[in-house]
Amino acid sequence: MASSPSNPETAPDGASLAAMTTDQPKKIDPVYYNWSSTFSILLSRMTGSRDVPLEEKYFTEMDALKADTICQRCDSNRDYLLQYSPIVRFLKDEVEKLGGDLNKDNILCRMCTNSQSGGFSLDHGILLCANKFRNRGHQEDTMAHEMVHAWDHLKFKVENDNLRHQACLEIRASTLSGECRFSREFFTKNQWSVTEQLQRCVRRRATLSMMARPGVRDEKHAGEIVNQVWEGCFRDTRPFDEIYR
């Protein structure tokens, strides 16, 4: 991607991309990380006896144990999507028309420590959180989301400290990437409503992203910023003619 002066390496929610990644722990006992242990943790969720800190530690270390395999799968899916995904190929072409270049050298798979599935920096490209993807479709949605961010940064004069600008970016990325389509919300988020489901999903995701940004006080404040720019940003489907999916 083209560089911009002093542009911080930021994720969509304002977090540092470097801070999202993690190194593999030096000592891990692979015997502990087996199907029986995983089943016990899942069973504890059903019985109401969860130990959340223990669960997080367990799954984080299990991811680290399998980091090479997880990142290789992410790399393979990235290469496949760059070649065969209609939405990814379209956005890649549109970014190129604006002088940018997204490819396997600047779309990088890494292990991440937080709940996000990806991040974008105009200077460094796209970060894909390999250990956060449920499947290739989830990775496709994330790539499309970050590629919309890339297009917006090249097309518009985006101010990193302007909360209205950032809210607009999140509204557009969630609307156009496909991550808020009904089938995904129905099967992964248990969102059963059909009427205005897309709008509610986009508002929810944009608000959550804004809550993590410096200068945003709380959920109410984040929602107010999203509402201020909602109409124009939700209806702006560029570079698509309409919402693709």
UniProtKB/Swiss-Prot annotation:
Keywords: Hydrolase, Membrane, Metal-binding, Metalloprotease, Mitochondrion, Mitochondrion inner membrane, Protease. Transmembrane segments: none annotated. It is found in: Mitochondrion inner membrane. It holds the Pfam family Peptidase_M76. The active site is at residue 146. One of its GO terms (molecular function) is metal ion binding. InterPro entries: Peptidase_M76_ATP23. It is an enzyme of class 3 (hydrolase). Belongs to the peptidase M76 family. Has a dual role in the assembly of mitochondrial ATPase. Acts as a protease that removes N-terminal residues of mitochondrial ATPase CF(0) subunit 6 at the intermembrane space side. Also involved in the correct assembly of the membrane-embedded ATPase CF(0) particle, probably mediating association of subunit 6 with the subunit 9 ring. This is Mitochondrial inner membrane protease ATP23. The gene is ATP23.
